[in-house]
C-alpha cells in the first residue's frame, strides 16, 4: 500500500470512526489499484483502489452533487476519493450490522451470505498477512517500552 493511500485511509478511518486497520484490510482483500476498473459477471463494475462497485455511483453522485460520469472518473483516478467512498460504505455497513465489524466487512463485498462469508475469509487472510508478521528490517522495541511479563510483576 502506498504511503499516500495510508494517509488517506487514516484520515477517512478517523472521520468515519472506523478501526484504523479496516480500510487497509479491505484494500488488500480487494486488490484494487488506482486507474483500474474490473467488470463483474452481473454487469456491474468495480472501480479503483478499494474496488467501489458501480451500484454505489448514483448514491455517490447524489451526495457529492457530481454527475455519475464525474463520480466514475474520480473513483478510478482519485484514490483518496475512492478511499473516502469506501469509508462511507463501511460506516453504513457498520450501522446496518449493529456494529459487527466482521459482518460489515463481508457486506462491503456482498449481501449474499455465500459471497459474504468467502470475502470475510479472504479479508481475514489479508489481515493476518498484513498485521501479524513483523517487518524483519525494523529493530526490536527496547525492553523499557514493553511492560514486564506477567510472571515478573510484583503482587499488589
Model regions and ranges:
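Gram-negative outer-membrane assembly/targeting C-terminal domains
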Residues: 147-149, 153
Amino acid at each position: 500500500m502506498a504511503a499516500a493511500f495510508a494517509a488517506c485511509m487514516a484520515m477517512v478511518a478517523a472521520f468515519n470512526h472506523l478501526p484504523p486497520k479496516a480500510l487497509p484490510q479491505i484494500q488488500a482483500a480487494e486488490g484494487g489499484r488506482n486507474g483500474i476498473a474490473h467488470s463483474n459477471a452481473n454487469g456491474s463494475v468495480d472501480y479503483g483502489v478499494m474496488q467501489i462497485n458501480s451500484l454505489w455511483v448514483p448514491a455517490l453522485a447524489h451526495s457529492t452533487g457530481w454527475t455519475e460520469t464525474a463520480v466514475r472518473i474520480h473513483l478510478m483516478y482519485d484514490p483518496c476519493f475512492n478511499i473516502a467512498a469506501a469509508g462511507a460504505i463501511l460506516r453504513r455497513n457498520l450501522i446496518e450490522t449493529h456494529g459487527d465489524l466482521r459482518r460489515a466487512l463481508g457486506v462491503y463485498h456482498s449481501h449474499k451470505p455465500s459471497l459474504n462469508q468467502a470475502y470475510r475469509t479472504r479479508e481475514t487472510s489479508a489481515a493476518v498477512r498484513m498485521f501479524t508478521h513483523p517487518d524483519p528490517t525494523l529493530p526490536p522495541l527496547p525492553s523499557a517500552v514493553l511492560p514486564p511479563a506477567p510472571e515478573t510483576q510484583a503482587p499488589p
